[in-house]
């Protein structure tokens, strides 16, 4: 890299890393005023509309969205394709990926929600973007994420008592990606 480019790079880095302190019109530092909920400081978590919603409302909405996706999977008129192909005409990212995937329903009656959509890779290899054919020099692997679910905890039959629920994190395949 020649020296003008090096100098420009150094200047850009120094501007980016320089501490920024707000100043008032006289050039003095502003005092520590009351923190604004819209402008978080270095030790504050930004407050947005989502974080102001009560946690149970977000969980209900999350479960409703999962239920809608499961209903769409059950009611889908499209046959479950198990073919390794990319369809660039579709807007769904799982069908346009170089490691396409489909969804199946993961059912567990002791879980709330009992049904979760789970990704399954449609290819052993990955789709070559130049030939649009499966290339087995790479491998399609599922991408996992942890999702919150509620588990029903009921006492065993000799012990009477009501069932309880506990929120736990469950690992679910959410998509597929290519690896070498």
From Swiss-Prot:
GO terms for cellular component: extracellular space. Residues 23-32 have a biased composition (Basic residues). Residues 1-22 form the signal peptide. Keywords: Cytokine, Disulfide bond, Glycoprotein, Secreted, Signal. It comes from the Eukaryota. GO terms for molecular function: cytokine activity; signaling receptor binding. Disulfide bonds join 121-176, 126-178. One of its GO terms (biological process) is neutrophil chemotaxis. It holds the Pfam family IL17. InterPro entries: Cystine-knot_cytokine, IL-17_chr, IL-17_fam. It is found in: Secreted. Belongs to the IL-17 family. Stimulates the release of tumor necrosis factor alpha and IL-1-beta from the monocytic cell line THP-1. This is Interleukin-17B. It comes from Mus musculus. The gene is Il17b.
